Amino acid sequence: MSYFAEKLAELAQVGLNRSLPEIEHQGKWIIAQNRKMLNFSSNDYLGLASDTELQQTFLQNILQEAPLHQWFSSSSSRLLTGNFPIYARLEQLLAQRFQRETALLFNSGYHANIGILPALVDKHSLILADKLVHASLIDGTRLAGCDFYRYQHNNLAHLTQLLEKHTGQYRRIIIVTESVFSMDGDVAPLPQLVALKKAFSSQTEVMLYVDEAHAIGVYGANGLGMAEFFDCIDDIDLLVGTFGKALASMGAYLICDQLIKQYLVNTMRPLIFSTALAPINVAWTHFLFEKLPQFQPKRAHLARLSQQLKQAVELRNGDTLATQSCIVPFVVGENRQAVEKSQYLQQQGYYCLPIRPPTVPKGTARIRFSLTADLTEAELNGLIACL
């Protein structure tokens, strides 16, 4: 046991020790250490998680559909007895909205990302992943067991070099990226990635895998993410997103062709061997996803707040890493500086958290401001005054 104590002491010495926070939620407020603070660290981008009117309407609706006891647990894998009708209804709604053949649900974004890639590749496959993709995609790539390279972040020239070098050597190449990057807030050049995929597909099957976890609900005319914004939904082979952020629910989805879905149902271990989401979670997601186009005013307000905060940080000579989203990083550099800045902002009434290595590269510790549509301009100005 002394080994673990030593390792924890080493983490504490360099400002990397972590602990689970004791917090309470009151809408857009966080209560911690007897202090009430505005939440600037949530992924509840549209502010739906605290919308009690929506919640009450939803609960009234589901009680009319089925008895209460049928909603709380699936009690099984979907391939056994856990496949309730609401799953198919949500998958059909997703396929209809994205105008693609089909969709497949998962328990979480992490669950999706560690399962899809290992199921679809073999020793004749190559994965080319952006250097800054989420930890779940890195883990999925490692679990896949095939050859992989990580191209420089959003660097199309480097990706092109790798494609030129390896096309023809593998049966299948999968390009992997996020659309909105979770820590930097910048955006992948999806149209150019689609063009590269098409350009190299004559010699080798090239597929494009895009994780829209931080884009779904927030971007696009109907809230369908950056793929909708860039009008390239049809060109993305594996379009993944989550429900636990802007959609204030739980779970994840894949938009794909029917053949891919059927193959995953037969081969994806995290899907086959996991108890399915509770039906009430899936029903809540369906309820909100139906309303997604109606939330355009929330998206517009969020975009204005995001631009305002980005400009304010840059005016104070802060590095925002070219963010183009509602994730606004304020890079301070060293771990302890980030922790101290976070503590100061919390003392002023703003719940802002430090992000440190290994979540981000060494020397880029930061405050990661995550904005939500239920924040007001006056509340944002209060934060800006403390920067």
Swiss-Prot record:
The keyword Metal-binding does not apply. Keywords: Acyltransferase, Biotin biosynthesis, Pyridoxal phosphate, Transferase. CDD domains: KBL_like (cd06454). GO terms for biological process: biotin biosynthetic process. This is 8-amino-7-oxononanoate synthase. PROSITE patterns: AA_TRANSFER_CLASS_2. Belongs to the class-II pyridoxal-phosphate-dependent aminotransferase family. BioF subfamily. It comes from Haemophilus ducreyi (strain 35000HP / ATCC 700724). The keyword Acyltransferase applies. Substrate binds at residues 134, 359. Catalyzes the decarboxylative condensation of pimeloyl-[acyl-carrier protein] and L-alanine to produce 8-amino-7-oxononanoate (AON), [acyl-carrier protein], and carbon dioxide. Homodimer. Signal peptide: none annotated. It is an enzyme of class 2 (transferase). Its EC number is 2.3.1.47. SUPFAM superfamilies: PLP-dependent transferases. Pyridoxal 5'-phosphate binds at residues 109-110, 182, 214, 242. It catalyses: 6-carboxyhexanoyl-[ACP] + L-alanine + H(+) = (8S)-8-amino-7-oxononanoate + holo-[ACP] + CO2. Pathway: Cofactor biosynthesis; biotin biosynthesis. Its cofactor is pyridoxal 5'-phosphate. One of its GO terms (molecular function) is 8-amino-7-oxononanoate synthase activity. The modification N6-(pyridoxal phosphate)lysine is found at residue 245.
